[in-house]
Amino acid sequence: HHYLAAESGRITRRRKIKGRLHTVRQVAQKRRLIYKENKREYCLLDTDLGPVLQMEVGALLVGRIYNHSQDSLVRGQEKGCFGLGGSTILVLYPAGTIRSDQDILTYSDLGIETQIQMGEKIGEKLCLND
């Protein structure tokens, strides 16, 4: 299960965080703080939108996170892979720089997971006034 860079930019920080390996399924999120407790790795990217954080979260059957060694990323470039099965990627943008599609927001409010594929539209960048 390979994952890609969410944005293009220079990597300014990397961090590995030890943790447990709880399932990342929706039902578990109601009982545990999985994004806080699970093993994870992140990189902070310096992008045209400002700092963007991309974090890979390990899961119950995914004990290993393999990130490629590189100093910068291009949006859509393979960033790494999980050792077994699938897991979760979190991408945090500066406030006011993106707008998520309404269907994703609606499903999230209802506690329904939205699975996406590479190239599928999930939102849009907003115009930034300097």
Predicted feature locations:
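Contiguous, well-folded functional domains in the mature portion of proteins
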Residues: 1-130
